[in-house]
Every structure is written in structure tokens, then in C-alpha cells.
Amino acid sequence: MALSTRTQAACLLLLLLASLSSTTYLHQQMRQTTELQPLHGEESRADIAIPMQKRRKRDTNFPICIFCCKCCNNSQCGICCKT
């Protein structure tokens, strides 16, 4: 019994260390991308808005809709019941 408890504790410790290291890596990557972004805010916002307008309503690769059609009672579920 004590061996399995130690094994569980070791696994939990490894999971915590892995999540901590991945979190710090993601923060580092986010910091690098924000430093590389252009300083012109309006130009970058205009560049982002163009691809958003060209999106289709449904992506055939995923069963979840991009825009919820509100076919069920939960208006923000994101899953279309009609597909």
C-alpha cells in the first residue's frame, strides 16, 4: 500500500513539474511574440480583421460550428444540432 502511495505521489510530482515547465515555456513564447508585433496598432488590427471576414460559417473538419445557430435551448453551446 505504501509503495502505491509513493508511486502516486511521484506521478503527481512529475505532472506538476511538467505543467509548470510548459506554463513557463508558453509565457516565454507569448513574450517573444508580443515583442515581435509591429508598433502600429491600427495597421495590425486591420490585418487581423480581414481574415475574420473571410471565414465560412461551418468548418467541415470539425463538428462544432464557428457560429452557434441557437437551434437548442443553450444559446452559447457552440454545437449545431442540425448538422
Swiss-Prot record:
Propeptide segments, given as residue ranges: 24-53
Top-level taxon in the UniProt lineage: Eukaryota
Keywords: Cleavage on pair of basic residues, Disulfide bond, Hormone, Secreted, Signal
Database matches in InterPro entries: Hepcidin
A GO term from the CC aspect: extracellular region
Keyword Secreted: yes
Predominant subcellular localization, coarse grouping: secreted
Disulfide bonds: 65-81, 68-71, 69-77, 72-80
GO MF: copper ion binding; hormone activity
Coiled coil: none
One GO term of the biological process aspect: protein catabolic process
Conditions for induction: Regulated in response to changes in circulating iron concentrations, iron stores or the development of inflammation and iron-restricted erythropoiesis. Down-regulated following anemia induced by hemorrhage or hemolysis: down-regulation is mediated by ERFE. The induction of upon inflammation is mediated by IL6.
Signal sequence extent: 1-23
Tissue and organ distribution: Highly expressed in the liver and to a much lesser extent in the heart. Secreted in blood.
Subcellular compartments: Secreted
Any one Pfam family match given in the protein's UniProt record, by short name: Hepcidin
UniProt subunit comment: Interacts with SLC40A1; this interaction promotes SLC40A1 rapid ubiquitination.
PANTHER family listed in its UniProt record: HEPCIDIN
Protein family per UniProt: Belongs to the hepcidin family.
Function: Liver-produced hormone that constitutes the main circulating regulator of iron absorption and distribution across tissues. Acts by promoting endocytosis and degradation of SLC40A1, leading to the retention of iron in iron-exporting cells and decreased flow of iron into plasma. Controls the major flows of iron into plasma: absorption of dietary iron in the intestine, recycling of iron by macrophages, which phagocytose old erythrocytes and other cells, and mobilization of stored iron from hepatocytes.
Name under which the protein is recorded: Hepcidin
Primary gene name: Hamp
